[in-house]
Amino acid sequence: MRVRQLKPQLVTLLWLAVWMCGPAQAQQFSSDNYLSKPHGVATLILTVGERSDMFMTTFSLFPNWEFTTAAYTYHSQSRSIDEGYSTSYYVKWMLFENKAKTGGVAVKAGTGMEPGYLGAYGLEDAFQTYWMNVPITVPLFGNKVSWDLMPGASVTKDYGEDGDTAAAFTYTTRLAWYPIGPEWAVVGEVYGSEGEVESIPEYRVGLRWEPSQHAVVAVTYDDEFNGSNGGGFEIGVMLFSPPFACFHGCK
């Protein structure tokens, strides 16, 4: 997909970001932090890129819990990823948060795969994969740097020509540096998988703008370390609702 082909999608995405400017945050990163959104908040995530687009919704139905569904559409035809789509469903539980609310630990588990983790059999992997990981956030240098680590594991059923069950270790790490204050961050991450389902390691770098606790926009570039099927240029925005999705009333 050429960069110029992104223009209609970018215009739509930016219009949505402006229209809902209050509650916005960008999220095209493979890494995640420990944080669960406040109880009752619904989240809409939109990302457009050269390799794939993403539409994701998250509902914080219980305190410290998130329930997420995501859909990915693909433009690349390499690595067995024809133009098509895959889905992902998962839950996240925030286990621990420090007193300053700048770091903690969570657990995530679900099914489906995002583009950067697809192995040799492409979309066939995504619909047969179950996974778990542990997001960990560590604040450094007086909160000038935030370090996210997310080790995990996955199991893919009916993998390959023999239809065996295949396992993999997944890894993601991300650093966000705030050189001039909390509004602007330089972000970089590395992610991939090793084992019976192996993906080429990728890196992603970009800028993240955080004008308030409710608004963040990010522009990034993604590529493989030893390949040619990286995500390319991406722009993403995350839109938050006021608390409303509560079974027993929102406080």
Where are these regions (language model features)?
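Short alpha-helix boundary/capping segments
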Residues: 1-2, 24-25
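Bacterial N-terminal signal peptides
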Residues: 11-21
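A broadly conserved amphipathic alpha-helix scaffold signal in soluble, globular proteins
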Residues: 6, 15, 134-138
